[in-house]
């Protein structure tokens, strides 16, 4: 049974829509992938960001302490793996060739890298868990939350976060058709350096 009222659902939708539109690491990642590799790469990066937000929402609802206790040492190992992989993605982004978007062939492996970049850049921002822990109780009673409430919150995240990031990917793709190869290369360097920095931070903070 749904415990959230329509006013709360609409308020949550509006708040998440505004927050998703703010400039962030995920926006830069999605935009750079789309501008340099085509809209499909921006789309997959956006899907990774959405999955990361869904994971954070579930962690916030179930409790980070419970998750950390249940996973034990694997929680720390997972941070190391994420840090190394994110750094590797950053290096590959810097080294990636800038393609002509109208002629570039879509590579499944590169699409998975774009998805992983979006996911890991989101999961690396561990403050987001604390944000959701303080944010969600404003709209729903987390102590008496129903499964239908969780489904509504996740659907709201998909529509707002996903919609906004995909829109950013579309804009970056359209702009990318007009951006020079040199500027696309600069965008790749910025996004790659960002991923490496976040990956290193995960490693030294584990």
Curated annotation (Swiss-Prot):
Per UniProt, what is the membrane topology? Multi-pass membrane protein
- Quote the subcellular location field of this record: Cell membrane
Segments traversing the membrane: 9-29, 47-67, 74-94, 150-170
Q: What is its main location?
A: membrane
Per its record, how is this protein called by name?
A: Uncharacterized membrane protein slr1627
Q: Might you name a Gene Ontology BP term for this protein?
A: amino acid transport
Give the keywords, sorted: Cell membrane, Membrane, Transmembrane, Transmembrane helix
Q: Which family does it belong to?
A: Belongs to the Rht family.
Answer yes or no on keyword Ion transport.
no
Q: List the GO terms this entry assigns under cellular component, sorted alphabetically.
A: plasma membrane
Q: Which domain of life is it from?
A: Bacteria
Q: Name one Pfam family in it.
A: LysE
A GO molecular-function term, please?
amino acid transmembrane transporter activity
- Is Oxidoreductase set as a keyword in this record? no
């Amino acid at each position: 049974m749904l415990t959230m009222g329509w006013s709360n659902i609409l308020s949550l939708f509006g708040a998440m829509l505004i927050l998703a539109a703010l400039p962030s690491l995920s926006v830069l990642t999605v935009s750079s992938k789309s501008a340099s590799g085509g809209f499909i790469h921006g789309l997959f990066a956006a899907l990774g960001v959405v999955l990361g937000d869904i994971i954070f929402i579930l962690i916030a609802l179930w409790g980070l302490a419970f998750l950390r206790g249940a996973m034990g040492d694997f929680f720390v190992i997972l941070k190391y793996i994420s840090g190394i992989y994110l750094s590797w993605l950053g290096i590959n982004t810097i080294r990636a060739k800038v393609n002509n978007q109208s002629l570039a062939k879509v590579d499944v492996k590169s699409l998975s890298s774009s998805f992983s970049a979006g996911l890991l850049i989101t999961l690396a921002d561990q403050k987001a868990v604390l944000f959701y822990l303080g944010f969600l109780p404003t709209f729903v009673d987390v102590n008496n939350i129903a499964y239908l409430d969780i489904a509504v919150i996740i659907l709201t995240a998909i529509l707002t976060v996903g919609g906004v990031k995909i829109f950013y990917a579309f804009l970056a793709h359209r702009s990318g058709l007009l951006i020079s190869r040199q500027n696309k290369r600069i965008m790749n360097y910025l996004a790659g350096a960002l991923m490496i920095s976040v990956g290193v931070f995960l490693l030294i903070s584990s």
